[in-house]
From Swiss-Prot:
Signal peptide: none annotated. It comes from Bacillus subtilis (strain 168). It comes from the Bacteria. It catalyses: Endonucleolytic cleavage of RNA, removing 5'-extranucleotides from tRNA precursor. Consists of a catalytic RNA component (M1 or rnpB) and a protein subunit. Might be a component of the prossible RNA degradosome complex composed of rny, rnjA, rnjB, pnp, pfkA and eno, and possibly also rnpA. Interacts with RNA helicase CshA. This is Ribonuclease P protein component. PROSITE patterns: RIBONUCLEASE_P. Its EC number is 3.1.26.5. GO terms for cellular component: ribonuclease P complex. InterPro entries: Ribosomal_Su5_D2-typ_SF (IPR020568), Ribsml_uS5_D2-typ_fold_subgr (IPR014721), RNase_P (IPR000100), RNase_P_CS (IPR020539). It is an enzyme of class 3 (hydrolase).
């Protein structure tokens, strides 16, 4: 994922948490915040130390990152924070992608199709 598409700073995370909206399912919590000054979407990932060991947490982040990259073109330009919950450690890639797609649909984050 390119640097300009990452949320890294604590102040950016806090801004999204404080002013953004959230949706959740059993595996993930998704926070979003509309940023008119940004013309690209940015994503931040968070996996608690309560989930597995470092290898497991990094695996979860890789799966989320890949699923997000595949959906990136269809998503609105906003700031996103994805927080993994404990059940996320048991998911395969396909299940991770499906779970994230569910959250994106639930919060109407897909761009309108131009073919209509």
């Amino acid at each position: 994922m390119k640097k300009r598409n990452r949320l890294k700073k604590n102040e950016d995370f806090q801004k999204v948490f404080k002013h953004g909206t959230s949706v959740a399912n059993r595996q993930f919590v998704l926070y979003t915040l509309d940023q008119p000054e940004n013309d690209e979407l940015r994503v931040g990932l968070s996996v608690s130390k309560k989930i597995g060991n470092a290898v497991m947490r990094n695996r979860i982040k890789r799966l989320i990152r890949q699923a997000f990259l595949e959906e990136k073109e269809r998503l609105k330009e906003k700031d996103y924070i994805i927080i993994a919950r404990k059940p996320a450690s048991q998911l395969t890639y396909e299940e991770t992608k499906k779970s994230l797609q569910h959250l994106f649909r639930k919060s109407s984050l897909y761009k309108k199709s131009s073919s209509k």
